[in-house]
């Protein structure tokens, strides 16, 4: 596998070059602005492309090394793409509201995550011995915690890299990352402040198509990194389960012909439940499964 490919045309079609109105700009973004059209700043995509590539290389590197990557995007347009992309590449996300101290006060957040798991366990067991009112209260508490912590409950520690959509809205998250020296990849619109962003990517952070493109590229780079990391360690994820089924097939193969002789003499009713005949039918999917994995 290789890094995901993208082109100037893709960025243009996604509207990644459109900035904000000229009076809503941050002068620190001046070097990334190509010009203005109809009082709208136009982002210089010729600079965005190499910066985006650099960010994808970093993402792949962290993923290959087994690092954690946190996707952050709580604005309406980014919420769903952020969560979908993070789940697709087995990473973590915050897409509802950033709780102050999520990174800098991880111990307290861990306690909240433990409470969330406890609630999931209680409610998963149908809350035996609890009143309807109590179950309703517990459900509301769980749902509230799930919104804020659901995407990071399996993270197990602070991330090694953070990817952010809209630095203005996620300013607190970025401040916390900087305090902990966590590298930040961020999409920077013309009204953003590029200071403190380790891997800036000038681009439209409001258009849904542009956000989807950024998230897809990040997820693809992470998947590529994970595959590279597994290959380097000599582990083939696609074939990890394959040796189990052929082993069973080999063990069961000698026994498979045994029931054939008595099957002719035995009544039909007795032949049906023959326990030893069943594995022969089970052995066939093992080969099909191996072929699918190999393909």
UniProtKB/Swiss-Prot annotation:
Gene Ontology terms, MF aspect: structural constituent of ribosome
HAMAP family reported for this sequence: Ribosomal_uS2_B
Keyword set, alphabetical order: Ribonucleoprotein, Ribosomal protein
Annotated Low complexity bias: 264-288
UniProt-recorded name of the protein: Small ribosomal subunit protein uS2
Species: Phenylobacterium zucineum (strain HLK1)
Top-rank lineage group of the source organism: Bacteria
Transmembrane segments: none
UniProt xrefs under InterPro entries: Ribosomal_uS2, Ribosomal_uS2_bac/mit/plastid, Ribosomal_uS2_CS, Ribosomal_uS2_flav_dom_sf
GO annotation (BP), single: translation
Family: Belongs to the universal ribosomal protein uS2 family.
Gene3D superfamilies, sorted: Glucose-6-phosphate isomerase like protein, domain 1, Helix hairpin bin
Annotated region described as Disordered, given as residue ranges: 242-295
Pfam families (UniProt xref): Ribosomal_S2 (PF00318)
One GO location term (cellular component): cytosolic small ribosomal subunit
């Amino acid at each position: 596998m290789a890094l995901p490919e993208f082109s100037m045309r893709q960025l243009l079609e996604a509207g990644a070059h459109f900035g904000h109105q000229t009076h809503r700009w941050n002068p620190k973004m001046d070097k990334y602005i190509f010009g203005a059209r109809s009082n709208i700043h136009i982002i210089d995509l010729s600079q965005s492309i190499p910066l985006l590539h650099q960010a994808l290389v970093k993402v792949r590197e962290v993923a290959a090394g087994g690092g954690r990557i946190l996707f952050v995007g709580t604005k309406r347009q980014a919420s769903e793409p952020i969560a979908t992309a993070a789940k697709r590449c087995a990473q973590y996300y915050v897409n509802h509201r950033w709780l102050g101290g999520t990174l800098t006060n991880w111990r307290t957040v861990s306690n909240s995550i433990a409470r969330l798991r406890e609630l999931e366990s209680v409610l998963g067991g149908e809350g035996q011995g609890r009143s309807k009112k109590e179950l309703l209260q517990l459900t509301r508490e769980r749902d509230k915690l799930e919104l804020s912590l659901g995407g990071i409950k399996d993270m197990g520690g602070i991330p090694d890299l953070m990817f952010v959509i809209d630095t203005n809205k996620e300013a607190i998250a970025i401040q916390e990352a900087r305090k902990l020296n966590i590298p930040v990849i961020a999409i920077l619109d013309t009204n953003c402040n590029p200071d403190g962003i380790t891997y800036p990517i000038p681009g439209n952070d409001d258009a849904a198509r542009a956000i989807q493109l950024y998230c897809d590229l990040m997820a693809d780079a992470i998947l590529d990194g994970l595959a590279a990391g597994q290959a380097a360690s000599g582990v083939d994820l696609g074939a990890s389960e394959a040796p189990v089924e052929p082993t069973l097939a080999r063990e069961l193969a000698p026994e498979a012909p045994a029931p054939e002789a008595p099957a002719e003499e035995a009544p039909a009713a007795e032949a049906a439940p023959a326990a030893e005949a069943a594995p022969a039918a089970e052995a066939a999917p093992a080969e099909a499964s191996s072929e699918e994995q190999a393909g």
